[in-house]
């Protein structure tokens, strides 16, 4: 006969989703000239950090990526940090 362990079953940990830092009343605007804001969403190697890490909404992530690319094109941000 097989005996089943009667250990309590643990539910998987569910992390609460963070809110988007660009939504809300006094949220900062995404602007390609605001280099200090854009640098918070770029890794130390110069890559754009994904929204699952920064908790930015899908719409704002696209705006953020476009602003970072514009700033790179104008020479305000580096493409790659060596």
From Swiss-Prot:
* GO CC, alphabetical: cytosolic small ribosomal subunit
Q: What is its quaternary makeup?
A: Part of the 30S ribosomal subunit. Forms a tight heterodimer with protein bS6.
Disulfide-linked positions: none
The entry lists its GO molecular-function terms as: small ribosomal subunit rRNA binding; structural constituent of ribosome
| Organism of provenance | Rhizobium rhizogenes (strain K84 / ATCC BAA-868) (Agrobacterium radiobacter)
The entry's function note states: Binds as a heterodimer with protein bS6 to the central domain of the 16S rRNA, where it helps stabilize the platform of the 30S subunit.
Record protein name field: Small ribosomal subunit protein bS18
The Swiss-Prot or TrEMBL record describes its family as follows:
Belongs to the bacterial ribosomal protein bS18 family.
List the SUPFAM superfamilies hit by this protein, alphabetically. Ribosomal protein S18
**Which InterPro entries does this chain map to?**
Ribosomal_bS18 (IPR001648), Ribosomal_bS18_CS (IPR018275), Ribosomal_bS18_sf (IPR036870)
Q: Which GO terms describe its biological process?
A: translation
Instruction: List the signal peptide residues.
Output: none
Per its UniProt record, what Pfam families does this chain match? Ribosomal_S18
Keywords, alphabetical: Ribonucleoprotein, Ribosomal protein, RNA-binding, rRNA-binding
Which PROSITE patterns does the record associate with it? RIBOSOMAL_S18
